Amino acid sequence: MIPAHDPGPASGLAETLPAIPASAGALIFDRAGRLLILKPTYKPGWTIPGGVMEADGETPWAACRREVREECGLDVRQARLACVDFRPPRPGKPGGLRFLFDCGAFPDDELAAIVVQPEEISAYQLVPVRAALDLLRKPIRRRVKAAWRARGTCYLENGRPVPGVTQ
């Protein structure tokens, strides 16, 4: 219900709204359909390019582009939203929203020029999607698998499709 009179920011409404952390990731392919995956230095397993949105009001799309540029030097110019995943809070973890963008196939010369950020990334590889699913960390694996299967935009909760929401 919308109040008849909006008291404005002094009402304290902003302080009662949830602060939801968010991150954005990128699905980047080569012309053969292989997926770019990265091996982070700060956690086990493989992941995709991406990371946390900045607290200064950065948008999911801007975060995706920034993280890809920082982590592997690629310039993402276009994409489609592949997935939004709501992760509920857990003990020691704030939860939040995870955005996944399908950035399409990059030209071979751009992929050959990848330069990883050595403080964060120790290796990268282009692998068939099915093989990538075996290598990716579990939460990201679910998201990538759902987006790959949907071939369109999907909505997930905790990495799983939601009954009643068309995928």
Model-derived regions: residue spans:
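Short, solvent-exposed loop/turn segments at secondary-structure junctions
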Residues: 45-46, 85-89
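Acidic, metal-coordinating catalytic segment for phosphate/diphosphate chemistry
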Residues: 1-25
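Unchanged
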Residues: 53-77, 87-139
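Conserved Nudix-box catalytic region and its N-terminal flanking loop in Nudix hydrolases
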Residues: 30-70
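A structural signal for short, well-ordered beta-strand segments
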Residues: 24-26, 81, 99-103
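Nudix hydrolase/Nudix homology domain
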Residues: 44-46, 118-167
